[in-house]
Structure formats: C-alpha cells, structure tokens
Amino acid sequence: MIGVAEVQELQKFRQYHSMMPTFTFESIKAWQKAHAFTLFVYKLTRNYPEDERFGLTSQFRRAAISIEANIAEGYKKLSKADKLRFFNISEGSIAECRNYIILSRDLNFINEDQYCELFYAIEETSKLLKAYCKGIINNSGVAD
C-alpha cells in the first residue's frame, strides 16, 4: 500500500507530465514503428539458439534499439544538420537489421512468415523516417 507521501509525489509527477509539450519523439510515426519493430525482434530472438546469445541475437537487438534511440536523440537536436545526422545513423541501423533478417531466415531461426513480417516492418519504418527527413529538409516548421 502506498502512503500519503507517495501519492503526493505521484500527483506532482502527473501535474509536471501534463505540462510537457504534446509533441515528443514518441509522437513521431517512424519512432513508433521502430519501437514496435524492436519489441518484435526481442520476441523472436528469445527463440534463437542459446549459442547465438552473444552473436546474432545481441547484434540484432542492438541494431533494432539503435534505430529508435537515434530517432529519439535526433528529435531533440536543434539544427537540421544534427537532426539529419542522427536520422541517417538510424537508416544505417535499418540496413544492418535488414541483413540480420536475411541471415535469420537463411539460418532457419525464423520462418518465412516472420521474415516477411520483419521485412515489412523495417521497410515501413524506413519510409516513414525518410518522409520525416524530407519534411526537415523542406523546413516544415523545424528549427534550423
């Protein structure tokens, strides 16, 4: 059971959170897709062979996390160049994940349906990220 002090802290947190801007990196559709992709990668890689724990499993998870983390970090950068640099790093991690998807299928760690689902998810993430970058380049309300 929580006490009065904890309830007061929770109320302060809720009040602070309600004053935060409504548009955060979590609002970016590319980040949302990337996050869903990461969760799916974690789910699938739980079934990879134990001897891949520090190999493909670790690398695939790290690359998936990198996509969404760089979108989040890039969002907070002030200049277009900085934003685009982090989003470009995300695109590099997307390419890395494409490789791990193919490798996972070729090693029979995932089936054809899982392969297609992963590939579709990563392609959607890439398309959304490219569109977001195009908006930044065209200066659609993003600070220089």
Question: What residue ranges belong to the model's regions?
Answer:
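Short, C-terminally biased terminal segments at protein or domain edges
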Residues: 1-73, 77-144
